[in-house]
Amino acid sequence: MAAEISAKTVKELRDKTAAGMMDCKKALQESNGDFEQAMESLRKKGLASANKKSDRIATEGIIESYIHMGGKLGVLVEVNCETDFVARREEFQELAKNIAMQIAANPAVKFVSLKEIPQSIIDEEKKIELEKDDLSNKPQEIKEKIVEGRIQKRLNEMILLEQSFIRDSDITIEELVKRNIAILGENIQVRRFERFNLGEGLEKREDNFSEEVEKMKKK
């Protein structure tokens, strides 16, 4: 006997996945009312749909800014889509805003994706890990596996798309983008970003009070 699917459950699934009402109802019916299974089914369909669109050219979009409270931290991010129509959509602009906030919240993030990381950085991380004392007595094969895992973890900390979304830790930024691709029907790409910290790279002046007093006496 098929499980009874309530309108409330359908709405909850829609709120959680941003999929259409009919798609949510169908997913719940196919999973016999299992909410988690229905959610996973919709997630996979959304990612599959997004992957099909990922090769399409995206030259429209917006440059979103985020200034943190106090004005000491700011972010600029360029998010691209295929048409100006989608660029003006509230959902797209909300996505860009969330991504800008994500960058502000993750100071370790330096790159959009893995392919942007220079080989020199990867080689340096590998060198650091291989020289750690806790690996000195490990067999070479085991050592290489441990190093590979540590490097991947370190690189993931630098990659925007690998970060857990600050508003929903169950998904990554990559999954958030793909969900919006499924919703809006266009390829969406985070092209580039820049993070600004007030005074970054500048030497702060440290006045010596005693020296200042002596200078004043000589005047």
Swiss-Prot record:
Localization terms from the record: Plastid, Chloroplast
Pfam families named among the record's database cross-references: EF_TS
Family (UniProt): Belongs to the EF-Ts family.
Role description: Associates with the EF-Tu.GDP complex and induces the exchange of GDP to GTP. It remains bound to the aminoacyl-tRNA.EF-Tu.GTP complex up to the GTP hydrolysis stage on the ribosome.
Entry keyword annotation includes Protein biosynthesis: yes
Organism: Rhodomonas salina
Name by which UniProt lists this protein: Elongation factor Ts, chloroplastic
Keyword Secreted listed: no
Cysteine disulfide partners in this protein: none
Any one annotated GO CC term: mitochondrion
Major location (coarse): plastid
UniProt KW keywords: Chloroplast, Elongation factor, Plastid, Protein biosynthesis
GO terms, molecular function: translation elongation factor activity
NCBIfam families to which the protein is assigned, alphabetical: tsf
